[in-house]
Design a protein with these regions (language model features):
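N-terminal module of bacterial RNA polymerase sigma factors
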Residues: 2-60
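Hydrophobic side chains within well-formed alpha-helices
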Residues: 38, 49-50, 78-81, 99, ...
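Sigma70-family region 2
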Residues: 43-44, 80-98, 117-119
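ATP/adenylate-binding site constellation spanning eukaryotic-like Ser/Thr protein kinases
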Residues: 55-59, 80, 108, 117
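Short, intrinsically disordered, charge-balanced linker/junction segments flanking boundaries
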Residues: 126-131
Length: 131
């Protein structure tokens, strides 16, 4: 198995590197708090909880979205949109325990919508070229 795949953008590998070699203090702070504790932290200190949530899952969610879409920049947009809507719509109030599952499900659905849209655009381009 090779480390570098030419089909995936180089930024994906940079994200992977950052994930494995993130600053130690961030990793230590994140590892002491479970997802259930993080969910309960949203009721007392929303900003700290959101920052920890973002630090814990941003890179992982980007890597997950890239695996689905094969498009790094769009994957970043998908993940950023998720975090923005999570904060603005106060979705943290609706989650009771499975924060990780919720995040991955949202990213999967958004990534699949992107693929569906991309395929629709590509098929429309083919139809236009035939005419």
């Amino acid at each position: 198995m090779t480390f570098y795949n030419k089909n995936i953008n180089k930024k994906y590998y940079i994200l992977r590197f950052l994930y494995y070699f993130a600053p130690r203090n961030t990793i230590i702070e994140m590892n002491h708090i479970t997802d259930k504790e993080l969910v309960s932290l949203f009721s007392t200190d929303k900003e700290k909880a959101f920052n920890l949530f973002f630090q814990r899952y941003y890179i992982r969610l980007c890597m997950y979205a890239v695996q689905i879409t094969d498009d790094f920049s769009e994957s970043e947009d998908i993940v950023q949109s998720f975090f923005v809507s999570f904060w603005e719509k106060k979705l943290y109030k609706t989650i009771t325990d499975n924060l990780k599952g919720y995040a991955y499900l949202c990213i999967r659905n958004a990534s699949l919508k992107f693929i569906e849209k991309r395929e629709k655009i590509n098929s429309n381009d083919i139809l236009l070229n035939e005419e």
